[in-house]
Amino acid sequence: MSITMRQKDLRPAPALIEYKGMKFLITDRPSDITINHYIMELKKNNVNTVVRVCEPSYNTDELETQGITVKDLAFEDGTFPPQQVVDEWFEVLKDKYQQNPEACVAVHCVAGLGRAPVLVALALIELGLKYEAAVEMIRDKRRGAINAKQLSFLEKYKPKARLKHKNGHKNSCSVQ
């Protein structure tokens, strides 16, 4: 077995998180070598947007050729997002879910255990979950996700009705 294959086998599977009609796919970072496999996984989950919260390390041309938008919202590993990243995250969700309510938004950091799950947890909290339930939902599918510093941030986070269903349509959302 090659080293590359062993490393690939150790990677956690993408975690699909669904709540109130919104879908998020938490993944680890692809590479230029694994990008085609990554695109297949994204297509399988109806992803039209990838939010990259780590430093760029792969070429996004192939994703964009496939109609998948890449948005960079990098912030420091092991920490929680600054307010500007939080605001931009909710703008991305608003734009994408208004354009295509059935679509899934993928979000990744390096391992898919810290920064990416924190952004998804923020969305779940805005959709009405308590922080404990949001973290539990993510950890059920992404074991080891969210460190103590990030957990403390989520505990203190106050939802601001940024994601709210409109017209009773379960898949529509708006950012306020």
From Swiss-Prot:
The modification Cysteine methyl ester is found at residue 173. It is a lipid-anchor. Residues 174-176 form a propeptide. Expressed in the adult head (at protein level). Expressed in neurons in the antennal lobe and V-glomeruli (at protein level). Expressed in dorsocentral neurons (at protein level). Keywords: Cell membrane, Cell projection, Cytoplasm, Hydrolase, Lipoprotein, Membrane, Methylation, Prenylation, Protein phosphatase. Coiled coil: none annotated. GO terms for cellular component: apicolateral plasma membrane; axon; cytoplasm; nucleus; plasma membrane. Pfam families: Tc-R-P (PF22785). GO terms for biological process: cellular response to carbon dioxide; negative regulation of BMP signaling pathway. InterPro entries: Prot-tyrosine_phosphatase-like, PTP, Tyr_Pase_dom, TYR_PHOSPHATASE_DUAL_dom. Signal peptide: none annotated. The keyword Magnesium does not apply. The active site is at 109 (phosphocysteine intermediate). Disruption phenotype: Viable. Results in delayed hatching, locomotor defects and inability to fly. Results in defects in axonal target areas in several central nervous system circuits. Results in axonal and synapses defects in two distinct brain neuropils in the antennal lobes and mushroom bodies, respectively related to olfaction and olfaction-associated learning. Reduces size of the central nervous system neuropil (a region of densely packed axons, dendrites, and synapses). Its EC number is 3.1.3.48. One of its GO terms (molecular function) is protein tyrosine/serine/threonine phosphatase activity. It is found in: Cytoplasm; Cell membrane; Apicolateral cell membrane; Cell projection, Axon. It is an enzyme of class 3 (hydrolase). It catalyses: O-phospho-L-tyrosyl-[protein] + H2O = L-tyrosyl-[protein] + phosphate. Residues 13-166 form the Tyrosine-protein phosphatase domain. Compartment-specific localization and function depends on long untranslated sequences (UTR) in the PRL-1 mRNA. Belongs to the protein-tyrosine phosphatase family. PANTHER family: TYROSINE SPECIFIC PROTEIN PHOSPHATASE AND DUAL SPECIFICITY PROTEIN PHOSPHATASE (PTHR23339). Probable phosphatase. Inhibits growth possibly by negatively regulating Src64B-induced growth. Regulates central nervous system circuit formation and stabilization of synapse-dense terminal arbors. In dorsocentral neurons, regulates synaptogenesis in terminal arbors via modulation of the insulin receptor pathway, likely upstream of Akt1, and via reduction of PtdIns(4,5)P2 (Phosphatidylinositol 4,5-bisphosphate) levels. In the nervous system, plays a protective role together with uex in response to olfactory carbon dioxide stimulation. Homotrimer. Interacts with uex, possibly at the plasma membrane. This is PRL-1 phosphatase.
